[in-house]
């Protein structure tokens, strides 16, 4: 094996997702160990002190559950067990041990967030998951996220926490995905089998040739190998997010991260985050309904990059749910001028249209926020697309 990974400067960031694999939380005899996690926790603490946000995606629950079952002398009773159910039982048994390991490394409360694939497929649950994580970050709490293995359906799992981390990065609009593993990064070939294998510092495009460099073998305690990590990086790249794969066992990793540097493989996204989001909003199917807004709100959307507030809404057409993509038309204009993800369903919006944001709770008894459509979830339509995008005429 020739060469070493070069030290790289991290791109500017405010929010990152840091994924830690089972192998970094496992010591002798397969028991949980905080030896490597302690260094990564120092980076999280230093980031919080600097006003930055780190969301942890941590494996280790199944590994911890296996240890508890073995050392506790737990023996199954009569009847035939099921492999997937056994895995779920291990996750349930080990989840508290895994979160306790992390809590012992911080002087402030952590929050455990368990997600299933269905949480991100269902738009309302997707928005609720995002809102929960955003609220935790607003209070300075570090979310520790894992797949809810205990209730996940076999055919609807993320497969491994590499993929979960990529989904979470897209969910919360992370600036960067950091994947801590037990190898230094991607090599041109298997470094254990080929002495000519060279470290790959940068991947500009995840071509079949690049994917072929990765072996699919997982570590003893994990489920995702290098192939899985590149597939996760591919998902993050589609959302405009770069991924860096690095060695979490490196004794200098905390100091490097705190100084804004790393040694490893950086997988570049061909898109900016804004470009990826805009492209999706422009081409996602819109619901059979829409929102009519006044001239002032139309000017604010077109010129100021503002959120759409209920005070600017004059009417609602059709039926749509919270989390749907809806088209937005200005008064006296037949075609939509914008589209975005609505925070309120049509029936809710009819009750709050025209009111100030502070009155939403009074009218509904609850609130999903001050905006009907947040500016991060909204795109104005280029003139050439307005006729194409219009799925319905918004009359109200």
Where are these regions (language model features)?
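C-terminal catalytic "cap/lid" subdomain
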Residues: 2-396
């Amino acid at each position: 094996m020739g060469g070493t990974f070069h030290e790289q400067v991290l791109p500017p960031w405010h929010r990152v997702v840091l994924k830690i694999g089972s192998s970094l939380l496992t010591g002798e005899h397969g028991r949980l160990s905080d030896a490597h996690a302690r260094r990564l926790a120092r980076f999280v603490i230093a980031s919080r002190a600097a006003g930055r946000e780190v969301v942890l995606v941590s494996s280790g629950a199944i590994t911890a559950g296996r240890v508890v079952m073995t050392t506790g002398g737990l023996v199954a009773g009569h009847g035939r067990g099921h492999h997937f159910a056994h895995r779920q039982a291990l996750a349930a048994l080990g989840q508290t041990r895994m979160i306790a390991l992390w809590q012992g490394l911080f002087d402030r409360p952590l929050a455990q967030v368990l997600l299933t694939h269905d949480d991100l497929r269902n738009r309302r649950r997707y928005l609720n998951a995002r809102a929960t994580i955003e609220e935790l970050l607003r209070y300075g709490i570090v979310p520790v996220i894992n797949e809810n293995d205990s209730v996940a359906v076999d055919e609807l799992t993320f497969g491994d926490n590499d993929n979960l981390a990529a989904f979470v990065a897209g969910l919360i609009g992370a600036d960067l995905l950091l994947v801590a593993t037990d190898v230094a990064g991607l090599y041109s070939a298997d470094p254990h089998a080929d002495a000519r294998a060279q470290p790959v510092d940068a991947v500009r495009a995840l071509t079949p040739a690049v994917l072929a460099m990765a072996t699919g073998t997982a570590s003893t305690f994990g489920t995702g190998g290098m192939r899985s990590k590149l597939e996760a990086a591919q998902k993050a790249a589609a959302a405009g997010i770069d991924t860096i794969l690095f060695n979490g066992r490196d004794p200098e990793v905390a100091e490097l991260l705190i100084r804004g540097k790393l040694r490893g493989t950086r997988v570049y996204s061909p898109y900016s985050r804004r470009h990826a989001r805009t492209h999706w909003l422009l081409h996602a199917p819109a619901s059979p309904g829409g929102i009519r807004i006044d001239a002032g709100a139309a000017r604010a959307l077109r010129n100021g990059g503002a959120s759409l507030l209920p005070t600017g809404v004059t009417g609602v057409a059709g039926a749509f749910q919270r989390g749907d993509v809806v088209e937005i038309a200005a008064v006296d204009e037949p075609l939509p001028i914008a589209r975005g993800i609505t925070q309120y369903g049509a029936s809710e919006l009819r009750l709050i249209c025209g009111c100030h944001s502070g009155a939403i709770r009074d009218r509904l008894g609850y609130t999903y926020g001050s905006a009907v459509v947040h500016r991060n979830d909204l795109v104005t339509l280029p003139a050439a697309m307005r006729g194409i995008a219009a799925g319905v005429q918004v009359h109200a």
